[in-house]
């Protein structure tokens, strides 16, 4: 959520941001918000003046009654009229504040100056040079789905029977390889980069979705259990960020860095064009998430750190990848700046998104009321929140399986995963 003071003082900047985000339809909402804000401020002043008058006159009425020096009936009638006016003003103020909050929750975050202006994903910028590793693939390649079926380690058909399309089943060494990836990533983030591991709930309440920005704008994309008013998480970002919702943190505790594994659930299984095969379009997938809470002045260095920590996983696995700096027309509504990390699929001959690393500045913290105090006398400030996928295993598994496949139809296990799997290869007879 944006600061109303920013909107009030710099409306033209916000209008430009909305157009750069390809959201010009939100400009009337901004105008409405500013009009309601002006009316609210005027009403607050008038209401305060009437309440002050009522207090003064109430004292006069009490003095008249105490002294018995005359009748207070006229003043009492006047104050009844004032009370009615105050009640009407307070009712209007409540309506204005509700409307303003709805608009504030719907408006997207401001953009960092380094975010390139562009209309769509086609205008995202490649950040740095793509990273490549040599894998001997001079034979007829199978895609991840063909490998999974032939090796008996993935079962999409039975997953569909149990739950519907988009719910994969990992079998045998495929399940072990998936678990190895998760444990390797968690160990890397906690042991090498200082993250504290948390294992969060996979269901959250509406206040948590509101705090991280999925509610109300993206409410239709999450699975909902209406009888309990709980929602399956689309990402561990939601429960982990909300661990500190409503808290006032001490400056000595910052930065706070968490790493969390969770299953992720999304009703809309991504927008991947016509590609719907295998892991490229799923409703449930596994992901290790990195979440940070920082002081405002430290957040952009923290973003680079998160990106580097995600890249370190791919380098250790020797998976080819590239980094994109998302343009204004493709970045999520909540983020001020975002990097996407894409892994290369040799069978599909294209890059696949496996990680997003974002700085939300104080956008989420303002919604979730997460603040810190620099010292005992200073005014509380909002922290900056960040997160990054470290990484999503579904797309990562696609690239891993395809790059490490053998001419015989097996899959070699990356060196760093062997201590976790207990085997070095998945063979056709596995």
From Swiss-Prot:
Disulphide-bridged cysteine pairs: none
Subcellular location: Cytoplasm
Superkingdom, natural source: Bacteria
Keyword Membrane: no
Positions of L-serine binding: 235-237, 289, 389
Family named by the database record: Belongs to the class-II aminoacyl-tRNA synthetase family. Type-1 seryl-tRNA synthetase subfamily.
Assembly information from the UniProt record: Homodimer. The tRNA molecule binds across the dimer.
Function statement: Catalyzes the attachment of serine to tRNA(Ser). Is also able to aminoacylate tRNA(Sec) with serine, to form the misacylated tRNA L-seryl-tRNA(Sec), which will be further converted into selenocysteinyl-tRNA(Sec).
Name of the protein described by the UniProt record: Serine--tRNA ligase
Gene name linked to the record: serS
């Amino acid at each position: 959520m944006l600061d109303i003071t920013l909107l009030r003082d710099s409306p033209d900047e916000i209008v430009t941001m909305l157009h750069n985000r390809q959201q010009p339809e939100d400009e009337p909402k901004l105008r409405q918000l500013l009009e309601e804000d002006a009316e609210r401020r005027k009403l607050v002043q008038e209401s305060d003046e009437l309440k002050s008058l009522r207090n003064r006159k109430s004292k006069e009425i009490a003095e008249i009654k105490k002294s018995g020096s005359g009748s207070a009936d006229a003043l009492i009638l006047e104050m009844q009229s004032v009370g009615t006016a105050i009640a009407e003003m307070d009712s209007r103020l409540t309506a204005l504040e509700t409307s303003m909050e709805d608009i504030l929750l719907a408006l997207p975050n401001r953009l960092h100056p380094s975010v390139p202006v562009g209309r769509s994903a086609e205008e995202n910028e490649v950040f740095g040079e793509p990273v490549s590793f040599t894998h001997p693939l001079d034979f007829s390649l199978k895609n991840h789905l063909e490998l999974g079926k032939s090796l008996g380690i993935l079962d999409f058909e039975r997953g569909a029977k149990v739950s519907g399309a988009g719910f994969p089943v990992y079998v045998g060494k495929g399940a072990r390889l998936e678990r190895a990836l998760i444990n390797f990533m968690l160990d890397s983030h906690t042991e090498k980069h200082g993250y504290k591991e948390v294992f969060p709930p996979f269901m959250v309440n509406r206040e948590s979705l509101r705090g991280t920005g999925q509610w109300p704008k993206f409410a239709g994309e999450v699975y909902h259990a209406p009888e309990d008013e709980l929602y399956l998480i689309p990402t561990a970002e939601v429960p982990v960020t909300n661990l500190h919702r409503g808290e006032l943190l001490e400056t000595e505790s910052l930065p706070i860095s968490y790493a969390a594994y969770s299953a992720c659930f999304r009703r809309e299984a991504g927008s991947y064009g016509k590609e719907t095969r295998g892991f490229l379009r799923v409703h449930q997938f596994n992901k290790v998430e990195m979440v940070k809470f920082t002081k405002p002045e430290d957040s952009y260095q923290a973003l680079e750190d998160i990106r580097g920590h995600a890249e370190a996983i791919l380098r250790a696995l020797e998976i080819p990848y590239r980094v994109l700096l998302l343009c204004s027309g493709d970045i999520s509504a909540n983020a001020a700046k975002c990097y996407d990390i894409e892994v290369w699929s040799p069978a599909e001959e294209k890059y696949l998104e496996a990680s997003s690393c974002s700085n939300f500045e104080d956008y989420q913290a303002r919604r979730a009321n997460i603040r810190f105090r620099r010292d005992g006398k200073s005014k509380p400030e909002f922290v900056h929140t960040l997160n990054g996928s470290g990484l999503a295993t579904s797309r990562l598994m696609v690239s891993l399986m395809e790059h490490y496949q053998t001419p015989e139809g097996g899959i070699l296990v990356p060196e760093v995963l062997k201590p976790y799997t207990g085997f070095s290869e998945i063979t056709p007879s596995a």
